[in-house]
Amino acid sequence: IGYEKVFSMLKNGGAFARFANHPYRDKENVELSQEIDKIYDLDYNKYYNKERETISGYTEQQAKEIAMIASKYGFSDIRYELFYRERVFSANEYIELLGTYSNHIAIEESIRTEFFAKIKEAINNHGGIIKIHDTIDLQLARKG
C-alpha cells in the first residue's frame, strides 16, 4: 500500500526517498552478543513464542532487492546507497534505546523489567559498553 500511495501523490518526475536503519549488535564482542542472545531466548523469544533469528549484517544484495520493489509500482530511475556508522552505548543508554522499540514496549512490564535488567548486567559484565554497527539504506526512485 505504501508504494502505491507515494506513487499516486507524486507528480511526474517526482522523487521518492526512503531511509532504513539496519543495526547489527557488537560483532567485536562475541561473548557479550552470545550472552544477549541467550537472554533474548529466555525472555523475548519465549514471550513471543519465537525461535532465535540469525542476526547478520545487512548486505548490498538485500539493499538492491528491496530497492527494486519500487519497480513493481511504476517507479523508475531506482538507486540505492549504503552508509555506515557505529554507535557506542553504556548499559543504561542501551536499555533506554531498547525501551523505544515497540516490540519491546509490548512485553508485559514485569517480564520486560527483568529482561532489561539481565541485558544491562550482561553489558556491565563485559566492559560496560555495547557497540551497534548500523547500515543505513537510502533508496531513491522517480515517478515517470
Language model features with spans:
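Conserved Class I S-adenosyl-L-methionine
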Residues: 57-144
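Conserved catalytic/acceptor-binding region of the Class I
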Residues: 7, 11-84
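Short, conserved SAM-binding segment of the class I
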Residues: 2-6
